[in-house]
């Protein structure tokens, strides 16, 4: 008999279950309280109950745990300094959606060499999230598929669905099950209506198939996620200007949704020029000073060192510098956060 299945599978390897990994790296009572409390604070900001600004900031992607922890330690200092005005959350992205091909993130390829030691990558990701939360810094990530989130979602305070997946039915269903607030990016073409559709879908109850914490395929019934929101990330042109935000709020109002959103300073809004994030920041700060209540949060890409670098076999990497999108350096990060806090002063 001719084989009709697995014809293009090159390798199959056993994967640790989420339950097994959680036993190795368990959530402590203190971390559980921290995650729960930070989620509640974020929800209040997104609902307009808290006038502070949500600031999701950090490296484009995590590739070096030592550098990530140094960044988290510095970020905790900024959290303490500006906690009356800002809710600062660290961007901890372990999976990278690629337009074509490329390094897909720490979980898929922790050794940066195509060896795909996924079990090791999952361990590193969970270990880092525990350490960052233990510092008192909430974490944010993108949920890229239906499986990986099972290993880390209990340690995440804010999640994102990316521009390439906001229109995907299974991602909307997954968002309806997530325990944290979830932002939906507008499409890569700049269309924010698909993000509004995603918010509406994620608020509803859904049924979908997914492995549970023990790896058993399961039928999930969700209750819906009431904390979905738009992330304005630009497209072929930026969409962070006041008229863009007003148009998005009009669409939210049309469907009786909270008129609060997050603005991404990077990606289409900086036209892939990382230093333009500072220009976007200036514009957003002015909108806040002018009385905008729609801007509930921002996203920015920053790391210890400015820019980006390529992975070259046999050559050491520059410590604290991105290997994916270029980021702002630490001094610019401090300036950006200070400007945001100053602008938010006008809300009080």
Which functions belong to the PLM regions below?
Residues 54-67, 325:
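Conserved phosphate/anionic-ligand binding catalytic regions in large, soluble enzymes, centered on
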Residues 2-5, 72, 85-240, 244-245, ...:
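Active-site-facing alpha/beta catalytic cores
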């Amino acid at each position: 008999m001719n084989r009709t299945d697995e014809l293009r599978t090159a390798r199959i390897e056993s994967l640790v279950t989420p339950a097994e990994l959680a036993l190795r790296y368990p959530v402590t009572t203190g971390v559980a309280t921290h995650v729960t409390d930070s989620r509640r604070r974020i929800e209040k900001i997104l609902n307009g109950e808290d006038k502070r600004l949500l600031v999701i900031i950090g490296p484009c992607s995590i590739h070096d745990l030592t550098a990530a922890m140094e960044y988290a330690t510095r970020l905790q200092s900024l959290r303490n300094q500006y906690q009356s005005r800002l809710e600062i959350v660290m961007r901890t992205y372990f999976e990278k959606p690629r337009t074509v091909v490329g390094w897909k993130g720490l979980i898929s390829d922790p050794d940066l060499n195509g060896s795909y030691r996924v079990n090791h990558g999952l361990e590193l990701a969970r270990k880092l999230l525990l350490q960052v939360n233990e510092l008192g810094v909430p974490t944010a990530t993108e949920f890229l598929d239906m499986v990986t989130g099972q290993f880390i979602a209990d340690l995440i305070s804010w999640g994102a669905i990316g521009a390439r997946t906001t229109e995907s039915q299974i991602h909307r269903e997954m968002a309806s099950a997530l325990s944290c607030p979830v932002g939906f990016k507008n499409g890569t073409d700049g269309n924010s209506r698909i993000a509004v559709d995603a918010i509406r879908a994620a608020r509803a109850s859904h049924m979908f198939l997914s492995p549970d914490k023990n790896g058993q395929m399961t039928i999930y019934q969700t209750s819906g996620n009431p904390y979905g929101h738009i992330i304005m990330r630009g497209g072929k042109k930026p969409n962070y200007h006041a008229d863009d935000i007003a148009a998005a709020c009009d669409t939210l109002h049309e469907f009786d949704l909270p008129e609060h959103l997050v603005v991404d300073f990077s990606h289409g809004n900086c036209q892939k020029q990382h230093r333009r994030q500072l220009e976007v920041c200036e514009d957003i700060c002015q909108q806040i000073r002018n009385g905008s209540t729609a801007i509930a949060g921002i996203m920015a890409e920053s790391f210890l060192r400015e820019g980006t670098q390529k992975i070259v076999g046999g050559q050491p990497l520059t410590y604290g510098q991105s290997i994916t999108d270029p980021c702002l350096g630490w001094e610019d990060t401090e300036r950006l956060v200070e400007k945001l806090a100053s602008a938010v002063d006008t809300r009080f």
